[in-house]
Amino acid sequence: MKTYEGELIAEGLRFGIVASRFNHALVDRLVEGAIDCILRHGGREEDITLVRVPGSWEIPVAVGELARREEIDAVIAIGVLIRGATPHFDYIASEVSEGLANLSLELRKPITFGVITADTLEQAIERAGTKHGNKGWEAALSAIEMANLFKKLR
């Protein structure tokens, strides 16, 4: 039986990061975590393209444009959604998730999910680098592994 598995080596890979500006204090921590992860795994800063968009709603369309670039091996989507008093959160969270999943399948390129969806500000803070780690770092780690796996499978 032949088994394929990605490696955690970012050397030679090129990454796109699409990050929302809304909730920028937390998003910036996630972006820093993602970049730190790539660099600590052998990647170079010049091999990272960062795109800023107004909010999480705009993430999928920007991810799609970036992922269509031949030189990009994987894209990391980063944003922070915090539930409010209206159903707006549910609509945005659902559409962003579905949009990113569909793009990854359509484009056959790794697109990882570093979008925090939290019920409270406290939960979001915990996932942006405190109690529950940094979801930007985790999304970058998945992007590294999946980009390497795709290279092996092709």
Curated annotation (Swiss-Prot):
Any idea which UniProt keywords this protein has?
Answer: Riboflavin biosynthesis, Transferase
What taxonomic classification does the UniProt entry list for its organism? Bacteria, Pseudomonadati, Aquificota, Aquificia, Aquificales
Query: Would you tell me the protein name for this molecule?
Result: 6,7-dimethyl-8-ribityllumazine synthase
Which processes are annotated in GO (biological process)?
riboflavin biosynthetic process
The entry lists its GO molecular-function terms as: 6,7-dimethyl-8-ribityllumazine synthase activity
Gene3D superfamilies from the entry?
Lumazine/riboflavin synthase (3.40.50.960)
What Enzyme Commission number does this protein have?
Answer: 2.5.1.78
Q: Which NCBIfam families match?
A: lumazine-synth (TIGR00114)
Q: List the GO cellular component terms.
A: cytosol; riboflavin synthase complex
Catalytic residues at H88 (proton donor)
Q: What does this protein do?
A: Catalyzes the formation of 6,7-dimethyl-8-ribityllumazine by condensation of 5-amino-6-(D-ribitylamino)uracil with 3,4-dihydroxy-2-butanone 4-phosphate. This is the penultimate step in the biosynthesis of riboflavin.
Known pathway: Cofactor biosynthesis; riboflavin biosynthesis; riboflavin from 2-hydroxy-3-oxobutyl phosphate and 5-amino-6-(D-ribitylamino)uracil: step 1/2
Q: Which InterPro entries match?
A: LS, LS/RS, LS/RS_sf
Q: Binding of (2S)-2-hydroxy-3-oxobutyl phosphate: at which residues? A: A85, T86, R127
A Pfam family per the record: DMRL_synthase
